[in-house]
């Protein structure tokens, strides 16, 4: 928690200092009111007192109450501004950090957990800051100030208040000690419930297709029940605080009045009024002490959860990055568009075996390099090393003659147009999706966007869509078919005019005719770009300049289609499983 609070700016500390001044004023005015109450009590009991004197004392008491209220409002405004600025900055830092994560770091958490940490956890810390400035500063000041005032009164009253304070502290500490472990568990259970809910929503069609609603409901109920039980235990434990404090407060009042009655009964007549007046004042001060502890209870309710949330936020912010920026912006002259793999191997964290092993090849400017092989043989892993989604554990990957680790990530990725296996569209318009991202230019003109759409064979359906390139795209592109989303994703990559185009099984949602026309168009319009294609269909890659066949993470064949049909058994088996001998001829 302290580590996060260090992220407060100097402006926040100035506001905190202003809030502290208002708190001092508020406490002083609140603790002055009992003095005027004592004065009014004496005036009422004294013969010959003027009503004007009572009204003046009452007016001063009212002024103190209004002043205390105004100071409390000012404190609240300062606290709200500090907490809002802090949470906004913290959310920005978490988002920026997550943006820097590689697939390895994201895998260490989970999407559901990262969302919870970026929203709910930061809100918990924000609430603690608000309550901390409004209550945590005020309560100790109020308690100490009030105790100093009552210490000058009767020692029996002071002793009874001291006993009440010790009982309160012990009770609160026990409650917090019991509830804290449950609050720590609560956040992980919330992550689990979010994960189950997210899985169900994203896979709803599969769930329905297999009539698995009952199974999913059971998973949700189990996660929900465990979360509910933990919440109930934690909330019940913390919920006993208020009744416990109320009981102590009532017991303290009873003790004060009992002691007061005893003192008054044994006092001389002229001392009875003074003792009675002191008892009224002492009761008010004692209640201020107890109220201070009641305010602290509000902090203790928030503190366990906020402490856990702060730890989870720090886990994200302190996560070391496996992919670090280099310093170079440009490659070697004369090597533009060239990609080389030198004895590259890669192993996922905690895995025992390399996913790919000793991969070596060179792709020259303008060439089409295709990858094919069985599912899980490492095709996507190989091409994901070019934009540094993963870094090689052995060997080197070079772009334009420079190791990719030496580039800044921005400079490297400005050279690349990437189309993922699953087409990803963002909420906005067709134009905003095609012209998406920063490639080092000031933006894309409408003509460039339309040309990219035409090259990607998306012009026909875009023209038919109401609004054309300005047509609305729903979240995830849910208002477009799989093939349409795939073509718009391809248009987005083409629009950048990159040195390197990467298609990670990006033609799978296209029909054979569109696939063929698109590849022919790419060969003409993107002739200077080095093209990498991962595919399962022989028809998609048979015209490539170089086909790399992978099996169990190793290269088992490399060459053109006709060469591989003669020399590579794995390629030949894949080819014959899809096409007849006549079609392959």
Description of each model-found segment:
Residues 10-74, 78, 151-156, 262-276:
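Transmembrane helix-loop-helix hairpins at lipid-water interfaces of multipass membrane proteins
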Residues 11, 100-104, 120-129, 133, ...:
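An intracellular "coupling" helix at the cytosolic face of ABC transporter transmembrane type-1 domains
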Residues 14-36, 57, 61, 76-80, ...:
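Alpha-helical segments in transporter systems
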Residues 21-22, 29-38, 42, 55, ...:
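Juxtamembrane helix-loop junctions of ABC transporter transmembrane domains
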């Amino acid at each position: 928690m302290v580590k996060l609070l260090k992220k407060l700016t100097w402006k926040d500390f100035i506001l905190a200092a202003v809030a502290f001044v208002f708190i001092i004023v508020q406490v002083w005015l609140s603790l002055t009111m009992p003095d005027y109450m004592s004065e009014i009590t004496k005036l009422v009991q004294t013969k010959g007192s003027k009503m004007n004197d009572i009204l003046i004392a009452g007016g001063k008491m009212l002024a103190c109450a209004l002043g205390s209220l105004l100071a409390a409002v000012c404190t609240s405004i300062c606290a709200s501004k500090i907490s809002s600025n802090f949470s906004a900055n913290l959310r920005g830092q978490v988002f920026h950090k997550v943006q820097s994560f590689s697939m390895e770091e994201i895998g260490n958490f989970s999407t559901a957990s990262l969302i919870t940490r970026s929203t709910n956890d930061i809100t918990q810390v924000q609430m603690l800051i608000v309550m901390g400035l409004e209550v945590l500063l005020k309560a100790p000041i109020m308690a100490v100030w009030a105790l100093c005032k009552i210490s000058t009164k009767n020692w029996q009253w002071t002793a009874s208040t001291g006993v009440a304070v010790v009982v309160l502290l012990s009770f609160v500490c026990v409650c917090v000690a019991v509830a804290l472990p449950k609050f720590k568990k609560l956040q992980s259970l919330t992550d689990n419930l979010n994960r189950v809910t997210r899985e169900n929503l994203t896979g709803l069609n599969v769930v329905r297709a297999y009539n698995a609603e009952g199974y999913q409901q059971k998973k949700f109920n189990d996660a929900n029940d465990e979360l509910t039980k933990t919440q109930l235990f934690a909330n019940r434990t913390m919920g006993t605080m208020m009744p416990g404090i109320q009981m102590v407060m009532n017991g303290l009042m009873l003790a004060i009045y009992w002691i007061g009655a005893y003192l008054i009964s044994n006092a001389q007549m002229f001392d009875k009024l003074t003792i009675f007046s002191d008892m009224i004042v002492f009761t008010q001060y004692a209640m201020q002490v107890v109220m201070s502890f009641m305010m602290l209870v509000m902090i203790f309710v928030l503190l366990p959860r906020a402490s856990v949330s702060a730890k989870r936020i720090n886990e994200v912010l302190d996560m070391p990055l496996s992919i670090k920026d280099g310093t170079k912006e440009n490659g070697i002259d004369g090597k533009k568009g060239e990609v080389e793999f030198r004895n590259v191997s890669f192993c996922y964290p905690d895995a025992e075996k390399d996913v790919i092993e000793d991969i070596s090849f060179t792709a020259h400017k303008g060439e089409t390099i295709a990858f094919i092989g069985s599912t899980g043989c490492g095709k996507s892993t190989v091409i994901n090393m070019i934009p540094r989604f993963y870094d090689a554990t052995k060997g080197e990957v070079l772009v334009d003659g420079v190791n990719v680790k030496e580039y800044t990530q921005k400079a490297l990725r400005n050279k690349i147009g990437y189309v993922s296996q699953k087409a990803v569209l963002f909420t906005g318009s067709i134009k905003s999706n095609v012209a998406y991202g920063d490639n080092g230019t000031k933006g894309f003109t409408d003509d460039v966007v339309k040309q990219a759409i035409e090259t990607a064979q998306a012009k026909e359906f875009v023209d038919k869509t109401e609004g054309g390139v300005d047509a609305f795209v729903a979240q995830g592109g849910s208002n477009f078919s799989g093939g349409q989303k795939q073509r718009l994703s391809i248009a987005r990559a083409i629009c950048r005019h990159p040195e390197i185009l990467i298609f990670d099984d990006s033609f799978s949602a296209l029909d054979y005719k569109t696939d063929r026309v698109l590849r022919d168009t790419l060969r003409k319009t993107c002739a200077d770009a080095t093209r990498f294609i991962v595919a399962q269909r022989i028809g998609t890659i048979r015209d490539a300049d170089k086909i790399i066949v992978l099996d169990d993470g190793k290269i088992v064949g490399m060459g053109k289609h006709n060469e591989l049909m003669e020399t590579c058994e794995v390629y030949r088996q894949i080819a014959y499983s899809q096409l007849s001998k006549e079609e392959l001829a």
